Design a protein with these regions (language model features):
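Short, conserved structural micro-motifs that define repeat-unit consensus positions
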Residues: 85-87, 99-106
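Acidic, glycine-centered active-site loop in nucleotide-sugar glycosyltransferases
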Residues: 279-288, 292, 300
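A charged, aromatic-enriched C-terminal amphipathic alpha-helix characteristic of glycosyltransferases
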Residues: 306-339
Length: 343
């Protein structure tokens, strides 16, 4: 019998750019009754206390059990058909056992790699095997999940949100003059990303960096542009000479949220060469430009910056067609989840 999910409870971050927010808007677009519990409540405490719990208790949120109790209470009041937990969210093993006993179906969309040292948390790994199903956007997790004792899991990639990821309303001549000569990167200064950008700067590549913590690196601070709002990000992506699409290697990602988001917005993408990206974008120069490592990237950047506008437009049109025409919205991901759960 096909399960028709009409009531969805999301456990996630409702702030803009986060997966929890994207799933919330996707469920609303499908006409579902949906609520979201903000995981940030589990971490609200003085900085010293957060650090104490983080370092001495294995990345444990200060209010793990209290937040978990709020999940149980909300489920009993809202009575969702499905509970969707996003990533390494503060839902304890104890809470999952209670929810299962009460008959609630709880799944996890594993936004981060729990075997990445930066995210490793024993309390979460204890809970992970108790989910009814785990969806992961990285193939590298599949064998880990088997070894960990997770019985039911599926690969499900990231997506884009049509409400947020679309071409800018207008790209002005000032935008082009400001950004067309730059290689743009939008995202935080993770160590892997810093290493790549540092090599570009050493090679004399003109870069523009938007996101957190870039100013913390003295040799990159001059290229840091701070944070940009959603519309400005769309204009940057559409106007930049090229946009870097990097995976998080420490996370063993084959693609990232940006892989879908930037493609939906449109622009010239320099994409890390992975199997996931090849499956999404096709061969080199069909819709994106691939690079294999930092040395290869410098050469590909010169290729991208030297392209005629007509060439860039062909790549962009092909890229947007592959992503937008391929059922890659977060609403489509929700529908795919239901098909898998009903199989």
């Amino acid at each position: 019998m096909e399960l028709q999910i009409m009531r969805l409870l999301i456990i996630g971050n409702p702030r803009p750019t986060h997966v929890g927010q994207h799933f919330l808007r996707a469920a609303q677009s499908l006409g579902w009754s949906v609520e979201i519990l903000d995981v940030n409540a589990a971490y609200e405490a003085p900085l010293w206390l957060r650090r104490f719990f983080w370092h001495l208790f294995g990345h444990r949120p200060v209010h793990l059990e209290a937040f978990s109790d709020s999940v149980i209470t909300t489920c009993r009041e809202f009575k969702p058909d499905l509970v969707l937990v996003t990533g390494i969210a503060p839902v304890s093993a104890r809470a999952l056992r209670k929810l299962k006993k009460d008959g609630f179906r709880v799944v996890n969309f594993l936004t981060d790699d729990p075997w990445n040292r930066q995210h490793h948390a024993l309390w979460f790994l204890k809970a992970l095997k108790l989910y009814d199903h785990v969806f992961t956007p990285r193939h590298a997790n599949e064998l880990d999940l088997v070894r960990h004792g997770v019985v039911s899991f599926s690969y499900l990639p990231f997506a884009y949100s049509p409400e947020d990821h679309y071409p800018p309303e207008a790209v002005t001549e000032a935008d082009r003059q400001r950004w067309s000569g730059l290689v743009a990167f939008i995202g935080g200064a993770d160590p892997d990303r810093v290493a790549v950008v540092r090599e570009l700067v050493k090679a004399g590549v003109p870069v523009g960096l938007w996101g957190g913590y870039w100013r913390d690196h003295a040799d990159l601070a001059a290229f840091a542009q701070g944070h940009a709002d959603a519309e400005t990000c769309r204009r940057i992506i559409a106007s930049a000479g090229a946009n870097l699409c990097l995976v998080r290697r420490a996370n063993r990602d084959g693609h990232s949220m940006r892989s879908y988001e930037m493609a939906a917005i449109g622009g010239c993408l320099l994409v890390e060469d992975t199997a996931d990206h090849q499956n999404l974008f096709g061969p080199d120069l069909e819709s994106v430009i691939y690079f294999k490592d930092s040395a290869d990237l410098a050469a590909k950047i010169h290729r991208a910056l030297g392209m005629r506008e007509s060439e860039r437009q062909i790549l962009q049109n092909n890229m947007r067609h592959k992503v937008i025409g391929g059922g890659n919205t977060y609403a489509a991901r929700l529908e795919k989840m239901l098909l898998i759960l009903d199989a």
